[in-house]
Amino acid sequence: MAGPRPSPWARLLLAALISVSLSGTLANRCKKAPVKSCTECVRVDKDCAYCTDEMFRDRRCNTQAELLAAGCQRESIVVMESSFQITEETQIDTTLRRSQMSPQGLRVRLRPGEERHFELEVFEPLESPVDLYILMDFSNSMSDDLDNLKKMGQNLARVLSQLTSDYTIGFGKFVDKVSVPQTDMRPEKLKEPWPNSDPPFSFKNVISLTEDVDEFRNKLQGERISGNLDAPEGGFDAILQTAVCTRDIGWRPDSTHLLVFSTESAFHYEADGANVLAGIMSRNDERCHLDTTGTYTQYRTQDYPSVPTLVRLLAKHNIIPIFAVTNYSYSYYEKLHTYFPVSSLGVLQEDSSNIVELLEEAFNRIRSNLDIRALDSPRGLRTEVTSKMFQKTRTGSFHIRRGEVGIYQVQLRALEHVDGTHVCQLPEDQKGNIHLKPSFSDGLKMDAGIICDVCTCELQKEVRSARCSFNGDFVCGQCVCSEGWSGQTCNCSTGSLSDIQPCLREGEDKPCSGRGECQCGHCVCYGEGRYEGQFCEYDNFQCPRTSGFLCNDRGRCSMGQCVCEPGWTGPSCDCPLSNATCIDSNGGICNGRGHCECGRCHCHQQSLYTDTICEINYSAIHPGLCEDLRSCVQCQAWGTGEKKGRTCEECNFKVKMVDELKRAEEVVVRCSFRDEDDDCTYSYTMEGDGAPGPNSTVLVHKKKDCPPGSFWWLIPLLLLLLPLLALLLLLCWKYCACCKACLALLPCCNRGHMVGFKEDHYMLRENLMASDHLDTPMLRSGNLKGRDVVRWKVTNNMQRPGFATHAASINPTELVPYGLSLRLARLCTENLLKPDTRECAQLRQEVEENLNEVYRQISGVHKLQQTKFRQQPNAGKKQDHTIVDTVLMAPRSAKPALLKLTEKQVEQRAFHDLKVAPGYYTLTADQDARGMVEFQEGVELVDVRVPLFIRPEDDDEKQLLVEAIDVPAGTATLGRRLVNITIIKEQARDVVSFEQPEFSVSRGDQVARIPVIRRVLDGGKSQVSYRTQDGTAQGNRDYIPVEGELLFQPGEAWKELQVKLLELQEVDSLLRGRQVRRFHVQLSNPKFGAHLGQPHSTTIIIRDPDELDRSFTSQMLSSQPPPHGDLGAPQNPNAKAAGSRKIHFNWLPPSGKPMGYRVKYWIQGDSESEAHLLDSKVPSVELTNLYPYCDYEMKVCAYGAQGEGPYSSLVSCRTHQEVPSEPGRLAFNVVSSTVTQLSWAEPAETNGEITAYEVCYGLVNDDNRPIGPMKKVLVDNPKNRMLLIENLRESQPYRYTVKARNGAGWGPEREAIINLATQPKRPMSIPIIPDIPIVDAQSGEDYDSFLMYSDDVLRSPSGSQRPSVSDDTGCGWKFEPLLGEELDLRRVTWRLPPELIPRLSASSGRSSDAEAPHGPPDDGGAGGKGGSLPRSATPGPPGEHLVNGRMDFAFPGSTNSLHRMTTTSAAAYGTHLSPHVPHRVLSTSSTLTRDYNSLTRSEHSHSTTLPRDYSTLTSVSSHDSRLTAGVPDTPTRLVFSALGPTSLRVSWQEPRCERPLQGYSVEYQLLNGGELHRLNIPNPAQTSVVVEDLLPNHSYVFRVRAQSQEGWGREREGVITIESQVHPQSPLCPLPGSAFTLSTPSAPGPLVFTALSPDSLQLSWERPRRPNGDIVGYLVTCEMAQGGGPATAFRVDGDSPESRLTVPGLSENVPYKFKVQARTTEGFGPEREGIITIESQDGGPFPQLGSRAGLFQHPLQSEYSSITTTHTSATEPFLVDGLTLGAQHLEAGGSLTRHVTQEFVSRTLTTSGTLSTHMDQQFFQT
């Protein structure tokens, strides 16, 4: 059991010592954590331990030292011990010529949050073995590079022998994967892609590493070039195989491995799109796959490796890459090489002639750098390597000295949390084998882990222990009660209510006042010490507060009252018992003018000029009292002044005239003023306390001090002498100038009068500089008489070769800022140096007005800005004059004109009405400056202020050259003309700044505590200077000014500046008002490698106590006041949005002594590491500059002298909505001259949830001014962003506006003005397949919006809610053409006679019979004469609504085409029409079916006799019922954005779907028949994808569809081309940096076939949308689709909008393939194809068709889609293939693309030699 216990006094002493020595933060974590078990305790902090002593009554979770001090036995304390053991250590042998590291292995176990430091030794010899492997691109464009490499074999060997005596050299080559699209797979190209070349391959190891240089040269001579198609190469495959195939390549274990990668192209990488195009989906397995010939074999089955894979494998095998690339691909590899710890990048010349020099330079650079990285480290462990011997570079490697044993410090730290989860809850992140590896050798292997063991006492618990009254388990020294029991021994039933009466306070109905729990007749209060008393009636947070602190922080709250510390009294402990604060400067109490009460003086006679100890404030009396007494003294003593006469009687003091006045130090104040009446000066003094009263006396000197008598008679004489004096001065000046010119010609005189710079070189360090200029002294020697002016200039970046040439090539029209400095002809005052004073503002306005007036004569000059004033030290006799500094923006080419004009105006001493001093100006451009300085007579030294052009992009060491040009005025000669200035930019080891740019403090705090933080980038100490600067607060009146240095020791990251605040005097309130006092603290002069960060200046706002918000809530959440003054977590955090960009966050102060609070806030969903920090001195803060309608998370902690306390609970809050921005660009689909379809994009910044749009349109005149009222349309569905506007006035311009509304209101409008009639016309082309995006080729390169068709817009307003088609039709249908005013492009209308309108239901079997009598349905399936068509048994949705006998087919209305088939067979089973049941077709009937084209993949197409995209539905009534319920709709938008000449972003909008989406599929292929590629997107929230490695100037077709659990939805299709300039020698390789545009294909428009007779047809097509030149004609070829005959060619001349060709001599029932190409002066463009068949059949009994009918079908035969046409001589119209038909008007679809890509357009079919009228449709975008 327990041993002897220490005495209570010993415990007390030990606890006091520990409380002083230990950090409060650690104690807080162990004691404050809400733990319930031993295991939870030891995981809180690395220093936490647990006491299992049964008799222990204190808190069991604490530090081990405090548990011992509290009486817990050492053997009862559970603590987890860390371990560190070196398992392998071999000392470094410097005699060996190989890289070594010591130790080689260790085992370490750490507790969460614990760190372990150890040293690591690494040795790199002066010379080590080198393995050099050259990996070269063997594509055709590298042929000259290969030839040069063959010639340079001897030079390569020579360089290697200079680098090391032990080397091997090898060679490998690569091209790309031998598959489509990377390689041309035609047999002849696979054999020889280029003349005299090898077959294509992926990678081949040609020469393994060998010491025989001759063998290397001989084998290299036999190599030939190869080739591929696309520009990027497959070099990543080659690099990976080179790394992992160590035996095949021949890497030696102890040598330096160098891999030279030479190419001129970009690279393929994992999942970049080319692999998908090639059908390769599996990842690279990172294994060696070389055959016996050294050829890579798995290029067809495995993807390219990723960049992280290559980085990891090259580091694992100690391979250092050297990228030797040409300028064309330099930008790609410039970023790539930064991912490798140690690598090199060099620019390879076009023919690789400099590869040897590049290799030598790279090797020298690499061998001086060493990188040490931790590989395979678990997420719970962090490793950091530092060194005191070697400097760290930007990339993290060390700049080493080879031949020395380097010592490195390794820090291994076990994290407590990983991504917000405790590391002990993540078993996979707790341990691992870390490989600490340097660049050139094997490294240290660490078996590291985190201790997350369970306490052994928890595994040995006593279940239902007798110690716990059999009502609980005894675990780790205490009882864990079962449910329903409580108490230390679980002997109290929580369910018993019989004993709560003793816990009820008189007059209350809640036991324990609602603040505790009644257990066995006794109250157990909540809050762990917050509530006290028999009934928990006292709240220890409700005692009085002073300045926000409980009991003034000078006592504790007990039983509802403050128990004050010794020396303090009062209800809130705010009165000191001593009178130390009342002692005056003489040692008395309140200067004898009052008494001391509660530590403050209460003066008997209060005055404006008495301070807090009743002492007269003479500094406040002097400036105000003299002025107050002046008028009364003047009128009483001399009878003069403004109060002379009766008003003099108002003076309330007496005047006594005396002969002599006392000295100033003997009286309160001594004053002197000038009497305006006689110009004499009178003096007086004031005695006493300085407060004039009725009994006060002012002593006045009897005698005034008057000036001597006047001499008015001299004035006329002087007026006469002035002209003579002027003439004399003029003659003297001429004589002196002549003498000086003569003296300048004499050698003896000339030699002694020189000007020049004092020094010829300055060396500056940028981190020690306090300004961006340098005052460079210039001396004048010899005779100092007269005036000399020196003209000078400074040039930046003299160290860069060719810098002047580069500067000359810069755009001359580019606007650059010019700095201008002038010396004004006026003295400088203190107010001019303060930018917020009125005098400064007036002068600034005067300067800017006059200078703008002068410089406006130079073209392109903007107005002045940033005007400020200063003084120039060391400026001779004019250093008290005002210098103005300003900036004006002007073109770069305007510099000579600016310089000439400035010199001219300075010589004239005026800029318009602004007077300036001569001989001084400075004009600063972006890279140079010119100026002028003046030596006045007798002046020996002046300073030249030289700008230093400090910029972040400067070189580490840059040079400036200052040059004295000439002496335009004066006789001096130039001595030292040149000054070199060198500026060294050291890499910052750390950055020092303030925590925030502004702090708010209370005057009652007495001290402003300002945190200064240091972001440590490297070890060592840092130092900065600081000083305060007055603002509206004044030093020694509001605060005590301070200045000094802050020294950060190594590892220190936070310091605090303290500025003492002074109490506000009453006189300050009267004289200075209630303005906010603020002063500034600035950091400067960083030392020891420190840099100043932002902000390096902060503003301190002093708020008076009555200004602060002191509202504290009376009820607070329970929290234990921690012992020893530790801080708790702030309570009751509350956040409330104060606007769209503000959140008000407040909380209740914690217990303890908080000095301030730190608020951390971030956007919800972001990582907490991206949080913003804010400091506050009061328990509330306003978060500003937030995003509207955005969710934020925040929490707060308090900090004090011992550090930060715990954070509060997390609070989230959403900002209010803000009005949205204007909608996206408006797009117009011009249907006719009076009908347009208007669409718009969603606002770029919705700032909330869009609820509606408002569209307004109205007439405007020629000046775009409105005519009459605007019409408004409210679109209350925010997803419908389209509107069809009809009945507009023809040939009239309209103004259209669209604005959006959210919860905050209406946003700004987007406006467009367009006249439909004035737009260019072209033949109408309405796709049968809707929702195809149309790209406006004339809109430039901005493709944010697209014109498109939408079934949301093209609905019939009087029809159903969705476009629908049904074959539930009644009999006796009659077609009525929609011509004239009834023309509606949105509908195809079939009308029944009113007497025959049926009423059909979903189960109706009624069918259609073409003008046949209506009969009952035939379910028997037998044929009959004149019978009706039986309905298919295939289940379908309800039938179409019939209104007024009209059935509306949406046109184009849906994504499916309409197909009406006619047949003359007597009775046939159309088994191909339905995959489920036979579909019977009678000889005299017609059926309406639906053809699912290539944009809709039907799930019902199972028959192999049909094309895969063909399906027939017998009854479909609505848009939503075309597919199974829950199947996604078509994505509602398809948008293309070009990212480069070979990359494209494809975006779409989420489709409607009743079920959750599971992802998307994106397919794309070349329009002319390339291989199909598919991208699967499993994330339904991702609605865009980037497609790389497209071929430039090639057309691609894209299809997007969505998937739910019910299956795939319909597709959205679009065609796009990226046009760019290509390399002359490689047509598929775009020129780097060339412009690229997004466009549609330049093929002719869709082909339209019109059958004229059984053996002839008419072919028509449109002019290409992008002709790319002048069209001179077309080439049309016709051939049999199945072969069997030669092709026939036709030439069609002209450039009309639509061209036609009649083709005779065709055969019936034979499919023909037609191709049309446009011909320009540059050649033929891409071709448009179509297949047509003229079928001739006998006519059936169709009265409206006659004997022949035209039948259009769309089976996909072979790889083309085709159209079958049956000629008819009928004059009546009919519906064919879902197209619009009228009298003598039939439109057919034309096949445009191969495979599954079809583009259907409506066209005219002439049946009787008469052509119907065309309708126009244009597309424009504003």
Swiss-Prot record:
Cystine pairings recorded for this chain: C30-C48, C38-C455, C41-C61, C51-C72, C245-C288, C457-C476, C468-C479, C481-C490, C492-C520, C503-C518, C512-C523, C525-C536, C543-C557, C551-C562, C564-C573, C575-C598, C582-C596, C590-C601, C603-C614, C626-C671, C632-C651, C635-C648, C680-C706
Domain PSI: 29-73
Region ranges (Palmitoylated on several cysteines): 732-749
Region (Involved in NRG1- and IGF1-binding): 194-199
Tissue occurrence: Integrin alpha-6/beta-4 is predominantly expressed by epithelia. Isoform beta-4D is also expressed in colon and placenta. Isoform beta-4E is also expressed in epidermis, lung, duodenum, heart, spleen and stomach.
Post-translational modifications: Palmitoylated by DHHC3 at several cysteines of the membrane-proximal region, enhancing stability and cell surface expression. Palmitoylation also promotes secondary association with tertaspanins.
Chain intervals for the UniProt region annotation (Disordered): 1113-1140, 1400-1444, 1495-1525
Main location class: membrane
Modified residues (Phosphothreonine): T1487, T1530
Span of domain I-EGF: 457-491, 492-537, 538-574, 575-615
Record PTM Phosphoserine, positions in chain: S771, S1069, S1119, S1454, S1457, S1474, S1494, S1791
GO BP field: autophagy; cell adhesion; cell adhesion mediated by integrin; cell migration; cell motility; cell-cell adhesion; cell-matrix adhesion; filopodium assembly
Keyword Cell cycle: no
InterPro entries: CalX-like_sf, Calx_beta, EGF-like_dom, FN3_dom, FN3_sf, I-EGF_1, Ig-like_fold, Integrin_beta_N
Domain spans labelled Calx-beta: 979-1084
SUPFAM superfamilies per the UniProt record, alphabetical: CalX-like (SSF141072), EGF/Laminin (SSF57196), Fibronectin type III (SSF49265), Integrin beta tail domain (SSF69687), Plexin repeat (SSF103575), vWA-like (SSF53300)
Known function: Integrin alpha-6/beta-4 is a receptor for laminin. Plays a critical structural role in the hemidesmosome of epithelial cells. Is required for the regulation of keratinocyte polarity and motility. ITGA6:ITGB4 binds to NRG1 (via EGF domain) and this binding is essential for NRG1-ERBB signaling. ITGA6:ITGB4 binds to IGF1 and this binding is essential for IGF1 signaling. ITGA6:ITGB4 binds to IGF2 and this binding is essential for IGF2 signaling.
Assembly and oligomerization: Heterodimer of an alpha and a beta subunit. Beta-4 associates with alpha-6. Interacts (via cytoplasmic region) with COL17A1 (via cytoplasmic region). Interacts (via cytoplasmic region) with DST isoform 3 (via N-terminus). Isoform beta-4a interacts (via cytoplasmic domain) with DST (via N-terminus). Interacts with RAC1. ITGA6:ITGB4 is found in a ternary complex with NRG1 and ERBB3. ITGA6:ITGB4 is found in a ternary complex with IGF1 and IGF1R. ITGA6:ITGB4 interacts with IGF2. Interacts with TMEM268; this interaction prevents ITGB4 degradation.
Recorded disease: Epidermolysis bullosa, junctional 5A, intermediate: A form of epidermolysis bullosa, a genodermatosis characterized by recurrent blistering, fragility of the skin and mucosal epithelia, and erosions caused by minor mechanical trauma. JEB5A is an autosomal recessive, intermediate form in which blistering lesions occur between the epidermis and the dermis at the lamina lucida level of the basement membrane zone. Epidermolysis bullosa, junctional 5B, with pyloric atresia: A form of epidermolysis bullosa, a genodermatosis characterized by recurrent blistering, fragility of the skin and mucosal epithelia, and erosions caused by minor mechanical trauma. Junctional epidermolysis bullosa is characterized by blistering that occurs at the level of the lamina lucida in the skin basement membrane. JEB5B is an autosomal recessive, severe, frequently lethal form with variable involvement of skin, nails, mucosa, and with variable effects on the digestive system.
Protein known as: Integrin beta-4
Species assigned in the record: Homo sapiens
Phylogenetic lineage: Eukaryota, Metazoa, Chordata, Craniata, Vertebrata
